[in-house]
Regions:
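FMN-binding flavodoxin-like domain, especially the glycine-rich phosphate-binding loop
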Residues: 8-11, 15-30, 42-165
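Short acidic active-site motifs
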Residues: 34-39
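Aromatic-flanked redox-active Cys/Sec active sites in thiol-based oxidoreductases
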Residues: 2-6
C-alpha cells in the first residue's frame, strides 16, 4: 500500500510489487485510501510506504496506521518504505511507518528502505519529484528478496504449527 503526492512513491510501490510477484507472492498494490484496515486480515505481508514530508510520514499514512490500531496483526509480516530527498535533514516516513507496524504486532521482515527523489521547483515551490536513477530497479530487486524471505518465513511457521498438532 502506498500514499503518494507526486507519483514517485507509486512508481516505487509498483516496482516492489513486481519483485514480490517474481518471488511467487500474490499481491495487491493500492493506495491507502482504497483499503479498509479490516481487509488486511487476509494478508500475510503488509508493505506500506509514503513520501516523507516535514521529516515524517504524511497525515494520510498516519491516519491509516491509526485506523489499523485495533486490528489483530499478530503473525503478519510488515515492511516500510518511503520516498525522500537525499539529505540527513529530510527525516524518514519509513522510520515512522516501521515503528508503527512493529507497535501493531507485525514482524518487520526487513529493515526500512528509502527511495531517493529530487524535487522539481517553480518559483521556489516544490511542484513535483523525480526518482533518482536506479531506484525503481533497486526496489524491484528488493521485492524479490523480501518476497523470498516472506515465503521462507511462512513455510517455517507452517512447519512449526504442524509439529505442534
Amino acid at each position: 500500500m502506498f500514499a503518494t503526492r507526486f507519483g514517485t512513491t507509486e512508481i516505487v510501490a509498483r516496482a516492489f510489487e513486481r519483485g514480490l510477484r517474481e518471488a511467487g507472492l500474490e499481491t495487491i498494490c493500492t493506495r491507502t485510501g482504497d483499503v479498509t484496515p479490516g481487509s488486511l486480515n487476509d494478508w500475510d505481508l503488509i508493505c506500506l510506504g509514503g513520501p516523507t514530508e516535514v521529516f515524517t510520514a504524511t497525515k494520510e499514512v498516519k491516519e491509516f496506521l491509526e485506523a489499523m490500531g485495533g486490528i489483530g496483526m499478530a503473525g503478519k509480516f510488515g515492511f516500510a518504505f518511503d520516498t525522500k530527498l537525499d539529505s540527513r535533514m529530510s527525516g524518514s516516513a519509513a522510520k515512522y511507518i516501521e515503528r508503527a507496524l512493529d507497535d501493531r504486532g507485525l514482524h518487520v521482515i526487513a529493515a526500512r528502505q528509502s527511495a531517493i527523489v529530487t524535487s522539481r521547483r517553480d518559483s521556489g515551490r516544490i511542484v513535483g519529484a523525480d526518482l533518482r536513477k536506479g531506484e525503481e530497479e533497486r526496489f524491484e530487486e528488493l521485492g524479490v528478496r523480501i518476497g523470498k524471505a516472506t515465503e521462507e518465513a511462512l513455510d517455517r511457521m507452517k512447519r512449526v504449527a504442524e509439529r505442534q498438532r
